[in-house]
Amino acid sequence: MRILTVSPDQYERYRSFLKQMHRLRATVFGGRLEWDVSIIAGEERDQYDNFKPSYLLAITDSGRVAGCVRLLPACGPTMLEQTFSQLLEMGSLAAHSGMVESSRFCVDTSLVSRRDASQLHLATLTLFAGIIEWSMASGYTEIVTATDLRFERILKRAGWPMRRLGEPTAIGNTIAIAGRLPADRASFEQVCPPGYYSIPRIDVAAIRSAA
């Protein structure tokens, strides 16, 4: 499994992967989690996809998107500050140039059967490592996110605990929480699964031929 970084200038080139990503988001957020999200033609999107985020995709050897996450600079429009500000103790992020927001993190558990010793899916750990690696390479020192208590426990088990930015709050059918995570070498080494590999550009033909 590999991490593919899709920056705004690469949206068109990797359109098929992004289509898979939006379908996965619809399956996970609209289907399995039953969140109140907008799904059109089988794809989940929201207004934050219009702000030219970078996407990290966990790609299997057969060319399937096994997981994804969206990354936006915290100094610009973010889901946490504009949509879920009630999760923030002070009502705002106090964003700075070294802060990035992670959102729409999800994994297709049906594609991934291999687990590590702590029973976390390989795709989850691969994405954790990818987020930290991308953040450090992009000049960010911390990551902020809105998630739920279940995912907070997953982060803790992975050895990458989240520092809360407010109290747990009921939103829809989940108990949500906001927090910050360090983006540093120690965190990367803690979560990085064996065989981790990332590439900023990906050869689709090569991936398919390796299947």
UniProtKB/Swiss-Prot annotation:
Pfam families documented for this protein: Autoind_synth (PF00765)
One of the protein's GO biological processes: quorum sensing
Top EC class for this record: transferase
InterPro entries to which the protein is assigned, alphabetical: Acyl_CoA_acyltransferase, Autoind_synth_CS, Autoind_synthase
Keyword Acetylation set for record: no
Keywords per UniProt: Autoinducer synthesis, Conjugation, Plasmid, Quorum sensing, S-adenosyl-L-methionine, Transferase
Reaction(s) this enzyme catalyzes, per UniProt: a fatty acyl-[ACP] + S-adenosyl-L-methionine = an N-acyl-L-homoserine lactone + S-methyl-5'-thioadenosine + holo-[ACP] + H(+)
GO molecular function, one term: N-acyl homoserine lactone synthase activity
This enzyme's EC code(s): 2.3.1.184
Function description: Required for the synthesis of OHHL (N-(3-oxohexanoyl)-L-homoserine lactone), an autoinducer molecule which binds to TraR and thus acts in the control of conjugal transfer.
Family affiliation: Belongs to the autoinducer synthase family.
Name recorded for this polypeptide: Acyl-homoserine-lactone synthase
Lineage of source species: Bacteria, Pseudomonadati, Pseudomonadota, Alphaproteobacteria, Hyphomicrobiales
